[in-house]
Design a protein with these regions (language model features):
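Active-site and NAD+-binding cores of ADP-ribose-processing enzymes
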Residues: 1-131, 154, 158-314
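A short, exposed loop/beta-hairpin motif centered on an aromatic-Gly-Thr core
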Residues: 132-141
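Conserved structured core elements
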Residues: 141-145, 263
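Short active-site loop/helix that positions an aromatic residue
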Residues: 144-158
Length: 314
């Protein structure tokens, strides 16, 4: 970023992977030429983050040490220190309108009850995306009715003729004020749409500056509302970063992949969100095009309701 230090966007300058250039003497012309470079940079710093965890430079729950790593340091600067995470924050009360549920492949002789859908340490033998083996966090599909069934089936890797059980959940009455991080806020947006909003602001400021310059008889060199610019730029950065993360990091794993290694940085991010007072994470499914998931750090935040659905996969 080349701009007056007073208006320089704090977090973009070093290592973020988001490259915005070309603020001119009027302070408002943007060039969004770095998305491809940003994708590579974010993916690179994420891999370095994973490598540091695999080498034992810090453990997944040592957030103070993890923040010294480039990826989380930059992320924390944007999302925490500069309040960008506000754009990712939703309350449980805001997502109660969506259907939530959990599915499982049933044995032929099983007679499932609600307990079958509650996570229990002794049955969690492998790492999940945001939690190590043995950790009783509640993973649910969230969205419209048809979508959560499709997502749950995909997450369970069902095969034709499998017996499948599905149970709806409901958020606890005392959970409505809890906040969760929504990592999917930009999934439906294009980079062009994101960039257009910031560029439109820049063009409007140029017009205002030219108009004022004509009246005053000289060019205004610092005609930016710093707080307004900071807020707008932070929002753009959060949405762009979220989209890049979603596209470049949330990738499906193969059976041969080491889950403990591949999921370690996600598990660190979960601990980071916990340190900021969050109760869960909404994230996109890597195996279902229509589905989203939510992981709740306290499994009592939601409870089973209604009749258990029991059917064959066709």
């Amino acid at each position: 970023v080349t701009t007056n230090p007073a208006t320089r966007p704090f977090w973009v300058v070093v290592g973020s992977g988001i490259d915005v250039r070309g603020i001119d003497v009027l302070g408002q012309i943007f060039d969004f030429s770095g998305i491809e470079k940003s994708e590579k940079s974010i993916k690179k710093t994420w891999q370095e983050f994973r490598d540091a965890l695999s080498k034992g430079d810090f453990s997944f729950d040592d957030i103070a040490s993890a923040k010294k790593n480039t990826f989380l340091r930059v992320y924390d600067d944007l999302f925490n220190k500069n309040a960008g995470i506000e754009y990712n924050t939703v309350l449980i009360s805001e997502i109660e309108k969506y259907c939530v549920g959990r599915g499982t492949i049933l044995g032929e002789d099983e007679n499932p009850d609600f307990e079958r859908f509650i996570p229990k340490t002794e049955f969690i033998k492998e790492d999940n995306r945001f939690s190590p083996s043995g950790v009783e966090w509640l993973y649910l599909a969230i969205g419209k009715e048809a979508a959560i069934h499709e997502c749950a089936q995909a997450e369970c890797r069902v095969k034709q003729n499998d017996r499948f059980g599905f149970c709806h959940f409901q958020f606890a009455a005392d959970s409505t004020a809890l906040k969760v991080v929504d990592l999917t806020i930009a999934d439906e947006m294009t980079y062009k749409a994101l960039n257009d909003g910031l560029e439109t602001y820049g063009q409007e400021q140029v017009k205002k500056s030219i108009k004022k310059s004509k009246v005053l008889g000289f060019i205004l060199r610092n005609n930016v509302n710093v707080e307004e610019f900071k807020k707008l730029f932070t929002k753009w950065g959060v949405y762009t970063y979220s989209k890049l993360l979603s596209e470049q990091i949330f990738e499906p794993l193969d059976e041969k992949d080491n889950k403990s290694l591949m999921y370690a940085p996600f598990q660190t991010m979960a601990q980071y969100y916990i340190s900021l007072g969050y109760a869960g994470i909404i994230y996109g499914s890597t195996v279902s095009k229509t589905g989203k998931n939510i992981v709740l750090f306290d499994k009592t935040t939601a409870h089973p309701v209604g009749a258990i659905e029991d059917y064959r996969i066709l």
